[in-house]
């Protein structure tokens, strides 16, 4: 069994048919003792623009007013609070919260009108100070993925910037992220146009386009940013020194991109819903980040790969199951399994175990790992059941199944405010 003597804590948000449920779990000791606290209020905020849930601080809920940008602490979270997803800047004490805009236009009409949606940057502060709203920045429309670029040992001249992709615009906003550069700090200094006119029916060369970027990471091995354009089935190789697209690599059929811990391999996940109207075919592919060759491809019947992340050492890859499609295809899906792969010798990818967990009859099932080298725990939510599976990362067995809600839900999120966990 894994050594779980170190302390751990989780903050979870589960959407139960429009009502948000917020719970905090903490535990320690070899007997995996844990405590659960429910922070959900029975009533809504009563506001036109519901507050944003940012995280927990000293046992209180951190809420951001989207109109005034004021941040306050509360004993409870209103049931209509918006659980904004976020990206932690690894080089500062700041978190970037994303707003995808409304479902139809992708615009944050409160802050940007019809000109895009937003990224909100918050300074966490210390134990004795309130978090501070730094800036709300209008970027492009639709879902965002943020990638932080900064100098590293292998590439010490890289600029300090953040790449924010915009799904519905087909672009990447380059945001200055160097506090010593006051002219460019937290300003959009460049916009990368991801349009490929050969992939557009009308010969479009501008923004918006049909690139639909989703999945983007910086490799410290190559010093390049790899951006997956779902609409085109391409991976763009971008030089962060110039913000220019150097190469476009075919990678069709994959919906997300993940880099190996060594930065030398690109792992794509996707699903084929067209070949067989009764069965979904899940796919995992490994591309060499320097030769751009697909060096491994795995296909799993009746499986939709939802979230995937490496453990702390990079020797295991955990892939969660979830639901997609409709009719017979959806009925045949395996939505109760966690797939665990040996990645200690990439590009080899060997299945260690398909582990039975609870159900996820929804499109996304995240995963979390304690940010502690002494802990080997893995946490996988089961949204449909309203439970959380605690997994021993050494033996890859379920230690416990924890009830976190009275009923099931359709969307689950971990909060990464506390830095106590990492994942997806």
Which residue ranges define each predicted feature?
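Predominantly soluble domains enriched in secretory-pathway, periplasmic, or organellar proteins
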Residues: 1-424
